[in-house]
């Protein structure tokens, strides 16, 4: 038997609700405010069929470019064969949530501003760039009175 070509083909688990989360959608979902330029994550909610994104956008992150009463317009990158296209989709707000991908960056910006301000008051220079983790410090290994054992590979012997 061939595969069907429906819009929701292969979404048995993708659009299903988590355990003990079936039924009415919490009101907090509708209370969230979305503005132009917000970064949002797309995640289809099976309880609401209206305004549901296509399965190919599930789990993607996009930027809000338009806001209406019940839905938002989102720009999402989608790979089509060899190229990546910026697709504009309209999705109801039940199927999106604010992304946490920028939180760490914004937190770092805030910390850097604070460091700059303190350095300016003191008249010193401060390192703002993130540094890779340095090599670990040298340390001694305790042997507890035992001599270290020298390990050597067994010499290769050809057996015919």
Swiss-Prot record:
Keywords for this protein: Cytoplasm, Endoplasmic reticulum, Ribonucleoprotein, Ribosomal protein
Role of this protein: Component of the large ribosomal subunit. The ribosome is a large ribonucleoprotein complex responsible for the synthesis of proteins in the cell.
Gene Ontology MF term list: structural constituent of ribosome
Top-rank taxon, per record: Eukaryota
Basic and acidic residues composition-biased segments: 112-123, 136-145
Any one Gene Ontology BP term: translation
Family: Belongs to the eukaryotic ribosomal protein eL21 family.
Intracellular or extracellular location(s): Cytoplasm, Cytosol; Cytoplasm; Endoplasmic reticulum
Protein name: Large ribosomal subunit protein eL21
Matching InterPro entries: Ribosomal_eL21, Ribosomal_eL21_CS, Ribosomal_eL21_sf, Translation_prot_SH3-like_sf
Pfam families in the record: Ribosomal_L21e
Entry GO CC: cytosol; endoplasmic reticulum; ribonucleoprotein complex; ribosome
Quaternary structure note: Component of the large ribosomal subunit.
Biological source species: Chinchilla lanigera
Chain segments carrying region Disordered: 112-145
UniProt-listed Gene3D superfamilies: 6.10.250.3260, Ribosomal protein L21
